[in-house]
Amino acid sequence: MAARLCCQLDPARDVLCLRPVGAESCGRPVSGSLGGLSSPSPSAVPADHGAHLSLRGLPVCAFSSAGPCALRFTSARRMETTVNAHQILPKVLHKRTLGLSAMSTTDLEAYFKDCLFKDWEELGEEIRLKVFVLGGCRHKLVCVPAPCNFFTSA
């Protein structure tokens, strides 16, 4: 079954949160095991971050009831386009994680909805659609060196 996520704006923290489609309206993670991501150490992921809810290719904090630690998701295929040469999205997102002024939340929300989520809807399973993880979050990806399908749960 394909994993589907929705994008929700959290105005209180000025970040975009990824939520599994089918989660409760209050943004709580879906129950049940969706696959595993081994953690570098048991203490690397707090208990309230729902390590058992890890989806292949996503850091466990993506499923926290508080949302992911930082705005860090994008499409690798879009990273290769000339559009991103002007926006320099990774640098923009990194500035936001440091609390510096950069692209507005509205612009970022539009970028994600247009580029990433539209790809998921139109293309379905796309092995080149990846997760881009910025530094600063301790919930790192621990796999995905080669193309893999993080749309499908384990």
UniProtKB/Swiss-Prot annotation:
A fraction may be phosphorylated in insect cells and HepG2 cells, a human hepatoblastoma cell line. Phosphorylated in vitro by host protein kinase C or mitogen-activated protein kinase. N-acetylated in insect cells. GO terms for cellular component: host cell mitochondrion; host cell nucleus. Pfam families: X (PF00739). One of its GO terms (biological process) is symbiont-mediated arrest of host cell cycle during G2/M transition. Disulfide bonds: none annotated. Residues 68-117 are annotated as: Mitochondrial targeting sequence. Keywords: Activation of host NF-kappa-B by virus, Activator, Apoptosis, Host cytoplasm, Host G2/M cell cycle arrest by virus, Host mitochondrion, Host nucleus, Host-virus interaction, Modulation of host cell cycle by virus, Transcription, Transcription regulation. InterPro entries: Transactivation_prot_X. Coiled coil: none annotated. It is found in: Host cytoplasm; Host nucleus; Host mitochondrion. Belongs to the orthohepadnavirus protein X family. Multifunctional protein that plays a role in silencing host antiviral defenses and promoting viral transcription. Does not seem to be essential for HBV infection. May be directly involved in development of cirrhosis and liver cancer (hepatocellular carcinoma). Most of cytosolic activities involve modulation of cytosolic calcium. The effect on apoptosis is controversial depending on the cell types in which the studies have been conducted. May induce apoptosis by localizing in mitochondria and causing loss of mitochondrial membrane potential. May form homodimer. May interact with host CEBPA, CFLAR, CREB1, DDB1, E4F1, HBXIP, HSPD1/HSP60, NFKBIA, POLR2E and SMAD4. Interacts with host SMC5-SMC6 complex and induces its degradation. Interacts with host TRPC4AP; leading to prevent ubiquitination of TRPC4AP. Interacts with host PLSCR1; this interaction promotes ubiquitination and degradation of HBx and impairs HBx-mediated cell proliferation. This is Protein X. The gene is X.
